[in-house]
From Swiss-Prot:
Enzyme Commission (EC) number: 5.3.1.8
Induction behaviour: Up-regulated by konjac glucomannan and by cellobiose and mannobiose, the possible degradation products of glucomannan. Repressed by glucose via the carbon catabolite repression system. Also repressed by GmuR.
Zinc in keyword set: yes
Organism (species): Bacillus subtilis (strain 168)
Name of the molecule in the record: Probable mannose-6-phosphate isomerase GmuF
Keyword Isomerase: yes
Classification via InterPro entries: Carb_Metab_Reg_Kinase/Isom, Man6P_Isoase-1, Man6P_isomerase_Firm_short, MPI_cupin_dom, PMI_typeI_cat, RmlC-like_jellyroll, RmlC_Cupin_sf
Binding site for Zn(2+): 95, 97, 115, 172
Amino acid sequence: MTHPLFLEPVFKERLWGGTKLRDAFGYAIPSQKTGECWAVSAHAHGSSSVKNGPLAGKTLDQVWKDHPEIFGFPDGKVFPLLVKLLDANMDLSVQVHPDDDYAKLHENGDLGKTECWYIIDCKDDAELILGHHASTKEEFKQRIESGDWNGLLRRIKIKPGDFFYVPSGTLHALCKGTLVLEIQQNSDTTYRVYDYDRCNDQGQKRTLHIEKAMEVITIPHIDKVHTPEVKEVGNAEIIVYVQSDYFSVYKWKISGRAAFPSYQTYLLGSVLSGSGRIINNGIQYECNAGSHFILPAHFGEFTIEGTCEFMISHP
């Protein structure tokens, strides 16, 4: 495969969703409560599909199974990552995700979920929940039972451009007024701890998963802070956010024309802002804010022209 795979996202309506995915990127969203864009997804709950080339119309899940050469003949049976855009028009539930070992045992062999967030935009006084203040499981449980959420939850002020690494076992929640790009393990397993006593459209409170959450949550909280590393490569600024066992994440900021080498691994790309073109072997591939693509393994040397920002990730 010698060309990028551009992808058609899948959209998810959520109790807490809004219209920012349409307003910021021009997507045709299904409703005024659209919370998630599954941009690069091969998950059974919603697989994105290829928009261009001979594989157009195929789901990413199909391509992963039928064309391992695109991905460098990987060992795993499951596409490892999931890239989302999230419109937190309201607060998300306070939740936690299991690690691989727990999910394999208790969630039908699924992957665990370590994730990360890049804050694309947010309101002036925006915050998120990352971690808690309990020292022991007994204290954690007591604070839940007494409803002492203000005393339990660790709140952090945020601004556009912030990056957060959220390992499995970390209590967390996005809060209202936040537009986020999320890169995560390919999992849809969530254990809700607190949902603000909200009801869904049927007037029912959403299910909580306190028992499972207590089994997987990290107590006391461990803050995984990653200091970004900035590199200048010609007309590109490369910010290295994280290189972990699960994924590596970068931001490529292009101003003009920047040359890149051939990468042995495949790359997942999302255009955050601006517009540009990827040039390989004399062929140009246009991309704009809201475009999502996969560069195949051993794609070859390429150039990006334009004024744009990409979030790039790989396993």
